[in-house]
Amino acid sequence: MHLNKYSEVVERLENEEFEQVELGAEVYQQLLAIYLYQNKLADAKLLWMRVPANLRDDKELIQLNLLNIALQNNNYADFFKHIKYEWSERVKSPVEDLLNKQREELFKLMGSAYMSIYQHNLLELSLMSEDELKHACAALNWTEELDGDRVILKPKVQEAPPARGNDDQLLKLTEFVTFLEN
């Protein structure tokens, strides 16, 4: 997924917004969905503020704004709850790309923050089906263990990048202080 994937569409839609007086909800829907995918949350918020009052009742625009609010608050549970919606064809592609991107980020965060997590907790947070979760975990080389009747998922242990030695850091600091004194 490349962030420039929708750059031409965004440029066209932004020009349309600047040039035309009255736009339909479709333009705002597409622009809002792409801003969310590109992680331009401030732009999405400002766009929502520019949406005319008569269009703010559009269900899809409201749903996209709820996604924006969830992303701004880093609330994955709300994000995954609000993204479960029957999206129109014009916003389906960027919303699906956004969903995949957010799931990747969620798994990356979970993998770095936890040594293990109960499967039901991750299912509840990501709102994935059990099969989807199993495929995602298998793709990331996560392992499963049983704790009675509950499944524990264990992320693949990531090796920490080699830390610089204290001597190297001390030498660098000494050189810097010497430079400042001269």
Swiss-Prot record:
InterPro entries the record matches: COP9_CSN8, CSN8_PSD8_EIF3K, PCI_dom
Keywords per UniProt: Cytoplasm, Developmental protein, Differentiation, Nucleus, Oogenesis, Signalosome
Domain (PCI): residue spans on this chain: 1-167
Pfam families hit by this protein: CSN8_PSD8_EIF3K
Domain of life: Eukaryota
Protein name: COP9 signalosome complex subunit 8
Primary location class: cytoplasm
Function: Probable component of the COP9 signalosome complex (CSN), a complex involved in various cellular and developmental processes. The CSN complex is an essential regulator of the ubiquitin (Ubl) conjugation pathway by mediating the deneddylation of the cullin subunits of the SCF-type E3 ligase complexes, leading to decrease the Ubl ligase activity of SCF. The CSN complex plays an essential role in oogenesis and embryogenesis and is required for proper photoreceptor R cell differentiation and promote lamina glial cell migration or axon targeting.
Family as reported in the entry's similarity comment: Belongs to the CSN8 family.
Record text on subunit structure and interactions: Essential component of the CSN complex, probably composed of CSN1b, alien/CSN2, CSN3, CSN4, CSN5, CSN6, CSN7 and CSN8.
Cellular component, GO annotation: COP9 signalosome; cytoplasm
Location within or outside the cell: Cytoplasm; Nucleus
Domain notes: The PCI domain is necessary and sufficient for interactions with other CSN subunits of the complex.
GO biological process terms on file: compound eye morphogenesis; COP9 signalosome assembly; defense response to bacterium; imaginal disc-derived wing morphogenesis; oogenesis; photoreceptor cell development; protein deneddylation; protein stabilization
Gene coding for it: CSN8
